[in-house]
């Protein structure tokens, strides 16, 4: 008798994707983050759904409805903090996932990589709109500052901003539409994830050596299902510790004050996962230039495959490229720190140097270093 998982129309799709999928035998724990991102997305959708049952998208009641969730709803506080800190875990896994792709040359799977970049933009948009919903001080002013950046677009900028706001300022119409988009986008993300996996399974996974895995494959289950479960346990442990011991560690105290259009917070800053891009935006004095640099800080990922000059796919045996990669990582940490600092000396200068270094490393230094390594291979 044939196995039902191999014959049933629905189950055979699951079977060929998660059970009998031929996977490289040597992929390390850096390949765990795909499944962890799937787990994060599931946590966000489930907790978000329960929060939406009690939240009201109205400027008069949004802040108090979030307070009501935390105080009066059964286990509401844990649902709220799982959702808020779940977003941080989501971005942590995302950054590590992208870093893995850069280090091991996974960007050469161009369709998968490009869908991944679209996913990154979509997740960032979703997180930004979610941050506006509690309608605290940082929610309101964050929404005002970031949406206002679109006014830098020539000719249509001002009209575009007012169209997004639904009026002449961030108000009830803005909050309502942000809630609608924040609710629908995770489902669009889920669809994009399926496309991401579809393209990945067309080519098969990369591996740490960057070589072809065709000659040495093992079934995904039980080997990598068990490995992914271990990663999931670490993720849930970290998230649980964060939620139960210091749920407000990554938040902003200003967001515990209801939104007040007449009082500007001393330092307007987004959540920690946007700070690197925010620092790049602030380091350019020109508004349009800053917006372009902000977009390019993420979109630059799309041109990494074009800039690949190395003979070897992975950085595993390229020590000079490894050094440049870790300098880039340190630079991103620096940008994240600068994004959270006030706009004054010496932070402005450090931000400008770090921004120049960020683009220089990706566009010029790393491709040049790869060419040097190619020459060294011939010695």
UniProtKB/Swiss-Prot annotation:
Gene Ontology cellular-component annotations: mitochondrial inner membrane; respiratory chain complex III
Binding positions (heme b b562): 83, 182
Chief localization: mitochondrion
Subcellular compartments: Mitochondrion inner membrane
Domain of life: Eukaryota
Function: Component of the ubiquinol-cytochrome c reductase complex (complex III or cytochrome b-c1 complex) that is part of the mitochondrial respiratory chain. The b-c1 complex mediates electron transfer from ubiquinol to cytochrome c. Contributes to the generation of a proton gradient across the mitochondrial membrane that is then used for ATP synthesis.
Residues that hold a ubiquinone according to the record: 201
Note from the entry: Heme 1 (or BL or b562) is low-potential and absorbs at about 562 nm, and heme 2 (or BH or b566) is high-potential and absorbs at about 566 nm.
Protein name: Cytochrome b
Residue spans crossing the bilayer: 33-53, 77-98, 113-133, 178-198, 226-246, 288-308, 320-340, 347-367
Cofactor(s) this protein cannot do without: heme b
PROSITE patterns in alphabetical order: CYTB_CTER (PS51003), CYTB_NTER (PS51002)
Record-listed heme b b566 binding positions: 97, 196
């Amino acid at each position: 008798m044939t196995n039902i998982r191999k014959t049933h129309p629905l189950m055979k799709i699951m079977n060929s994707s998660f059970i009998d999928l031929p996977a490289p035998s040597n992929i390390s724990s850096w390949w765990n983050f795909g499944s962890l991102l799937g787990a994060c997305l599931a946590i966000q959708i489930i907790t978000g759904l329960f929060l939406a049952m009690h939240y009201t998208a109205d400027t008069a009641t949004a802040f108090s409805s979030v307070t009501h969730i935390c105080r009066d709803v059964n286990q509401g506080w844990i649902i709220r903090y799982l959702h808020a800190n779940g977003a941080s875990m989501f971005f942590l896994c995302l950054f590590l996932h992208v870093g893995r792709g850069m280090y091991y040359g996974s960007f050469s799977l161009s369709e998968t990589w490009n869908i991944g970049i679209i996913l990154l933009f979509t997740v960032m948009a979703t997180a930004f709109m979610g941050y506006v919903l509690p309608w605290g001080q940082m929610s309101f002013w964050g929404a005002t500052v970031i949406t206002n950046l679109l006014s830098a677009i020539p000719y249509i900028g001002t009209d575009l901003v007012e169209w997004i706001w639904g009026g002449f300022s961030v108000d009830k119409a803005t909050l309502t539409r942000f809630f609608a988009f924040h609710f629908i986008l995770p489902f669009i993300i889920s669809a994009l994830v399926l496309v991401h996996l579809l393209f990945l399974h067309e080519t098969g996974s990369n591996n740490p050596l960057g070589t072809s895995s065709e000659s040495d494959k093992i079934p995904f289950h039980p080997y990598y299902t068990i490995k992914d479960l271990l990663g999931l346990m670490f993720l849930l442990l970290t998230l649980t510790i964060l939620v139960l011991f210091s749920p407000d560690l990554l938040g902003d105290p200003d967001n515990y004050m209801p939104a007040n259009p007449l009082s500007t917070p001393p330092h307007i800053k987004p959540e920690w996962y946007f700070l690197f891009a925010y620092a790049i935006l602030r380091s350019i004095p020109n508004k349009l230039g800053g917006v372009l640099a902000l977009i390019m800080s993420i979109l630059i990922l799309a041109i990494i495959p074009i800039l690949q000059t190395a003979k070897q796919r992975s950085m595993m045996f390229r020590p000079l490229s490894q050094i440049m990669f870790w300098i880039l990582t340190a630079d991103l940490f620096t940008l994240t720190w600068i994004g959270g600092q006030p706009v004054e000396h010496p932070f402005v200068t450090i931000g400008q140097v770090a921004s120049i270094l960020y683009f220089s490393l990706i566009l010029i230094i790393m491709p040049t270093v790869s060419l040097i390594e190619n020459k060294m291979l011939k010695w």
